[in-house]
Amino acid sequence: MMILNKLRRAAALFVLLSIGGVSYGAGLFSEPLDYDQAFSLNPVNEGIQLGLGAVLSGSALVCDKFVDIKKNEYNPDDWKKSDIAVMDQLFMRPYSKPLHIVGTGTMALAMATPAIFAIMPSSEWLTIGVMYAETLLIANGIKEWTKLLVYRARPYMYFDDYPQDKLEDGDWNCSFPSGHTTFAFAGAAFTTMVFCQCFPASNWKYAVAGASFGMAVLTGAFRMASGNHFFTDVLVGAVIGSAIGFAVPYMHTKNFYGKFERKPKTASASLTPTGFTVSYNF
């Protein structure tokens, strides 16, 4: 009965969050916005970023599923609560499937926030889509490799009623960092960055940023409340996701491209009262 009540409350919260997201999206669509073409694609840039994301994510997948570089033997004596930092101990919880489900839902909503860019001209959809694909690929690759290299049991493993299936599939020691939080913050940062660059004069940019990051923060909170992650797992996931979510769009702006443009060489000559001056810029 207690689990059922938790599930009902979690489902109600999920519905409210969804309604809130739809409401701010509806208001956004009804407001005429002045659009700036802030981003563009470049063959070299896309080759590097898509290639990096594909290599990171692909190699991590191969090493995890086929090479088995991470050992998953569980020994209770290796994992003692007293060895955990005090800050992480404060947020430790046993496993909760209802909260796990809700956390996955908030992550999905945060990742779906770039859908608001449907208000932009259709000619920009490819640019936005490619940038977002690069964001998710790179964030996923960094997250997956960190999980492979860092051995950390999830908080629920320190409680007696830990889920047996998690132990069997090897997911129990992949706590660091939080993948859900990484994706949620990547989506939130990407949406915020792109919206603020494309609609700098819009009053909705604060609402977009608040709703997007609010959903990401809730994702991290639910990942801790469900017993899946420690506070530091969520914190690092938020940093990774935010960094990639801001960096990838920035590397498609005119300011970024301008740093690599060759300035034209110029020469000038002038006659002055004191002599003859020649200048050469390169």
What residue ranges belong to the model's regions?
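Structural signal for the C-terminal ends of transmembrane alpha-helices
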Residues: 118-122, 194-197
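Hydrophobic alpha-helical transmembrane segments of multi-pass membrane proteins
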Residues: 98-102, 129, 133, 178
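Interfacial helix-start motif at the membrane-water boundary
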Residues: 85-112
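Hydrophobic core of alpha-helical transmembrane segments in multi-pass integral membrane proteins
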Residues: 53-61, 109-116
